[in-house]
Amino acid sequence: MAGAQTNDDTFWLGADISGTTELEARDWKLYNSKGEIRENTALMKEIGLNAVRLRVWVNPIDGFCNMNDVLEMAKRARYYDMKLMIDFHYSDWWADPGKQTIPATWQYYKYDEMKYALAQHTRQTLQLLKDNKIDVEWVQVGNETTNGFLWPMGRAQDNMAQYAGLTEAGYEAVKEVYPNATVIVHLDGGCDLRRYEFIFDGLKQHGARWDMIGMSVYPYWDNDAGLTKSYQETISKVVENIHYLNKKYNCELMIVETGAEAKKPQQGKTIMKELINAAMTKCGGHCKGVFYWAPEAEGAYPLGAFQNHRPTAIMEAFTEAK
């Protein structure tokens, strides 16, 4: 069952800036709109954001986004008085609806051993943060777990009971360290109601708990996949789904990932302004925030919000949000 709804009316404007230390290691400089050099967290604060999202990988080859690296970035968020979301991938690298690879050191575990490993990794990471006086507001148990995680053991379509058991193990581990943290289960495709009912009906049926539903909302990918025909349709469906899911599962929601085309900054600003406005004013107070994913990203990834190492008009949508 979902957790009780809260009365906190703060709206969170955030960004996933998990790549910060890796960019610094590559000597990648960032600048504000005036051309002044800025550290990434400081730049997000300057833009007007009040929250940061950081992913955790179990044993990444290069060390970026392991628990110690996340601690370094979390200290910066604390310095700038920004609320913190921790996003556990439960993988050594990217986890998303198309891949949920078991960490190399966990790959031969049986189900009970996997639950223990997941819980222990969750506890150890969060305890490290807590020991360093870091407050954690939200914790994601899995990243875009539309098809479950820790495949094949926790693939939701084949093993819903095991996916639910693993999710519950994560939930309990979070609450052991941060009893007041909000635990999020996060899916992609916020415009597609069916995938949300499939996962959350399954979790509920098998006794797993969560406090908040996290959504990815990317009009660019929705249009590309044929889920919607326009960004307006994506936003409209997301608003409808937030109302429906809030009522059905008695929990609040948050858009924990979004993005727009970096090469079309004015269009991107329009999309983000409309999405943020809809989240703030059309969801009955049940959407608690919007987080842009990797705004500083440039190059192969098409949905960053920077050009020439500085923010484009897309980020003005966050600065101007009221």
Question: How should these model regions be labeled?
Answer:
Residues 18-20, 57-59, 89-93, 141-146, ...:
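Active-site beta-loop-alpha junctions enriched in small/polar residues
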Residues 10-12, 18-22, 55, 114, ...:
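Mature, Sec-exported extracytoplasmic domains of Gram-positive
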Residues 25-29, 94, 230, 244-250, ...:
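Aromatic-rich peripheral "rim/lid" segments of glycoside hydrolase catalytic domains that contact
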Residues 1-7:
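Bacterial Sec-dependent N-terminal signal peptides
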Residues 7-78, 82-83, 91-118, 124, ...:
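N-terminal substrate-binding region of glycoside hydrolase catalytic domains
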Residues 66-71, 96-202, 206-210, 222-240, ...:
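Active-site cleft segment of glycoside hydrolase catalytic domains centered on the general acid/base Glu
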Residues 8-9, 39-48, 72-83, 127-134, ...:
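Acidic (Asp/Glu)-rich catalytic clusters
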